[in-house]
Amino acid sequence: MGDNNNSSNFIKNIIIEDLKSGEYEKVVTRFPPEPNGYLHIGHAKSIVLNFSLADEFEGKVNLRFDDTNPSKEDVEYVESIKEDVKWLGYNWDNLCFASSYFERMYEYAVFLIKKGKAYVCDLTADEIREYRGTLTKPGKESPYRNRDVEENFKLFEGMKNGEFKDGEKVLRAKIDMASPNINMRDPVLYRIAHASHHNTGDRWCIYPMYDFAHPLEDAIEGVTHSICTLEFEDHRPLYDWIIQECEIENRPKQIEFARLNMTNTVMSKRKLKQLVDENFVDGWDDPRMPTIAGLRRRGFTPESIRNFCRAIGVSKASSIVDSQMLDYFLRDDLEKEAPRTMAILNPLKVVITNYPEGKTETFKIENNPDDASAGVREVPFSREIYIEQEDFMENPPKKYYRLFPGNEVRLKSAYFIKCTEAIKDKDGNVIELRCTYDPASKGGNSPDGRKVRGTLHWINVDTAIPAEIRLYEPLILEQQEKEGEEDLFLDHVNPNSLKVVKGFVEPDMKHVKSDEKFQFFRHGYFVLDGKCSKNGELVFNRIVSLKSSFKIPENK
């Protein structure tokens, strides 16, 4: 699907009108992550939106790091975010850091002080919260609100020069403590933080608040359309106030859209961190995580994520997207690209008693039956093979076409075999089958034309390559993420989200490279886990099942 879906028209219409009216000559968008964690599928929606709009309107897009909170930020996150954006298939026009503008932001703060639009306040964080009031009760003015300009300037200089402790003073905007919008009740613009910054070191001990820094960053960079999620809608009056009162010529426009919400998925950074810290997963790139790193390790393709984000579009109305929709686009991508191979997840040994001992032959099997250009591979076959345990039943129900005593099945691209005996252990479990084969059925068809309903995949015992195979289910059982349930959400963590089995794959798979993807015949799509496959030991992650009943909603 392309980018021109109806649900994103409201943003495009705004941009079109802005260009027509001459308000802006060129479109500049930005993706502005804070480098304090890893990107997730919700960020991917914003990335695709901003880069696609810039591309459609022949504009530019900035990758900007909102690095104004040194205690939580790290170069590690900067590099991982850059890698994720590139992996998704995008190249930014300008790489920017909020910290590069600290001097200019300080100058704008001084400008507001001299205009009488900002003041230094000595109230504690708790007192500021108390003075702010509520949605139904107006706030009350700080006792420090009417300090004169000279005193405010000297105190702010002192804050900058390290004369005060963390939390001892803040710089606040002087707006309206009775405003119905709580964000306009003298918000904090600067706070003291004696913390080393990943980019500026120890040069600064005061740092701008997000609501002050963000509009300034957009204006400084010449951003025209600052696209963000709906939780910032109530912050837009403050965004516009900062631009206006700082008297900046460039006037970016903030536009809000609904954030991505998905079934069986949490995207709160706090909740994701809790999953990592409490060892529900093995890191931020765990294949069950909705992070870009996790999706990548799981085997998702950049194209499938881009197509998903385009298909869901953007709107003002919040909604829940079925997580199966993401799987739909992934499956659609892998169906075309992934080579086919056979893998046995729960091995049951089969001895073909009338097959010559010591003989090995090979069968040519297509890598993709829908794409002749994918070529063929040679697969060895001999007297002993593995099939899946679930492909045999001693006492099957009606219309069971797989293997059972006396029944004949087709081995994919090989021979017909018939079960003659089931060998059991002392507990009565079937541990081995005895079968005979029909030499005339070579290639999987019999010259006498007899029909065989069941076709089984198999692997030659002598050349089988051991593999650990990881089968994933949704990490979160709750359909919808609920705000403010930081602890309760753990009650919905799926204890069976990972199942590990020891199986076998074809001999050619020993040469597989990290992140290569395959369709395991009848099992689904799998990828080699490059992080865990070491010293010749292969680990495969199931990316997604072969089929699903999910269909794209008509309005998409």
From Swiss-Prot:
Subcellular localization(s) per the UniProt record: Cytoplasm
GO terms under cellular component: cytosol
GO molecular function: ATP binding; glutamine-tRNA ligase activity
Catalytic activity, reaction form: tRNA(Gln) + L-glutamine + ATP = L-glutaminyl-tRNA(Gln) + AMP + diphosphate
GO biological process: glutaminyl-tRNA aminoacylation; glutamyl-tRNA aminoacylation
Residues annotated for L-glutamine binding in this entry: 66, 210
Motif ('KMSKS' region): 266-270
Enzyme class: ligase
Binding-site residues, ATP: 34-36, 40-46, 229, 259-260, 267-269
Motif 'HIGH' region: positions: 33-43
PROSITE patterns named in the record: AA_TRNA_LIGASE_I
Keywords recorded for this protein, A-Z: Aminoacyl-tRNA synthetase, ATP-binding, Cytoplasm, Ligase, Nucleotide-binding, Protein biosynthesis
Main location: cytoplasm
Enzyme Commission code: 6.1.1.18
Keyword Protein biosynthesis: yes
Keyword Oxidoreductase (UniProt): no
Source species, domain of life: Bacteria
PANTHER family: GLUTAMATE--TRNA LIGASE (PTHR43097:SF5), GLUTAMINE-TRNA LIGASE (PTHR43097)
Quaternary structure note: Monomer.
Assigned protein family: Belongs to the class-I aminoacyl-tRNA synthetase family.
Name of the protein this chain belongs to: Glutamine--tRNA ligase
Organism for this UniProt entry: Clostridium kluyveri (strain ATCC 8527 / DSM 555 / NBRC 12016 / NCIMB 10680 / K1)
